[in-house]
Amino acid sequence: AGNLNLQRLFVLTGSTTASASELIINSLRSYLDVRVIGKQTFGKTVGMRSTMNLKNRLDTSPVTFHIYNKDREADYEDGFHPDVAIDEFKSDLAEFGDLKDPLLGQAITR
């Protein structure tokens, strides 16, 4: 087990942010201050396991588990609402790592 040695984490999101990204937000918010910057996430609180039957050409992905954090919280079916709402596509895009990027700029200045 390790320690991130952080007090606060900023997560940059878009409307298609889901699944593993939301799992990270939900899991870490039990341990530190997690701030969401961007758009509301998708809201996927479950996981699936895909199986393929080649003989019948059938692929199924049933829901096999519900994701909770250590506090038994899984209350993001409607997604995580951003602490700072930004539509990154309403302004000019910048190079990766450039502080002119609206999401990164907000995270760095907080």
Language-model segments: residues:
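C-terminal "post-core" interaction segments
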Residues: A1-R110
